[in-house]
Amino acid sequence: MDAALVTVGDELLAGDTENTNATWLARELTERGVAVKRVLTVPDVEGAIADAVREYADRYDAVVVTGGLGGTPDDLTMDAVAAAFDRSLEENDLARADLERTLKAITDSYPDLNVDIEAEASIPAGARPLINDAGLSPGAVVENVYVFPGIPGEMQRMFEGVADEFAGDVDSRVLYTSEPEANLIERLDAVRNRFGVLVGCYPDRAAGHNRLKLRSEDPGKLDEATAWLREEVRLVDPDADTQVGEAVGEDDSG
């Protein structure tokens, strides 16, 4: 499964809010074997959101959209997703019932809360509603597009409710080495060409090591590539910061 992430919000583009949703979702999807191919942040502009959703829905197996749900003027995501699929917004009975239950439960704490329930409970026609157990605004699933709130706690709770719908065949292995990145280039090219796996090197200067991540849809090739690197690269244990392997050709006899 291939996926794209679309995060919505002027505050993200301005740097006022850290885009933790993209990082969290990318990690969760990758752990499920999903290949995240694109991460895009768009402003609170209906046309920009609709264009991104339309393009990615055609190109990828799944699209996850976060942010822009609610009752404020800049909350345009549901309108944009509906437009991307040439649908209207319709009040959803399940979403309305959940909103009414939630509002009843919090009315004593927020007596002046004024919510347009019909607008809040409206999702693209024919969409599947996603109930918000941690907040107000419902999400929705429209064909292969999943729409979640932008508040991290609400987004994570909603994602967990549909997490089983995301599954892929991409597996990964991670190794750590104290060797300089520049010294690894030839061996990383070799393992990529020999075994047909994807490999990346990610420096962690604070820890004093490099993280090597191998990815493939073929578990056998991945195991072979990992075993080859274990023989060719000096590895370390990132927790103990001790060497766990020797590079071929090194003489440790004293």
Residues covered by each model-derived region:
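Secretory targeting signatures
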Residues: 1-2, 52, 253-254
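Glycine-rich phosphate/diphosphate-binding loop of Rossmann-like nucleotide-binding domains
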Residues: 1-44
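Glycine-rich beta-strand-to-loop/alpha-helix junction loops that act as flexible
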Residues: 8-10, 65-73, 150, 217
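Secondary-structure boundary/capping motif
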Residues: 14-17, 48, 73, 221
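Proline/glycine-rich low-complexity loops and linkers
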Residues: 34-41, 48-51, 58, 63, ...
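An accessory alpha-helical subdomain
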Residues: 143-156, 160-232
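Conserved short beta-strand edge segments in small beta-sheet-based binding/regulatory domains
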Residues: 232-254
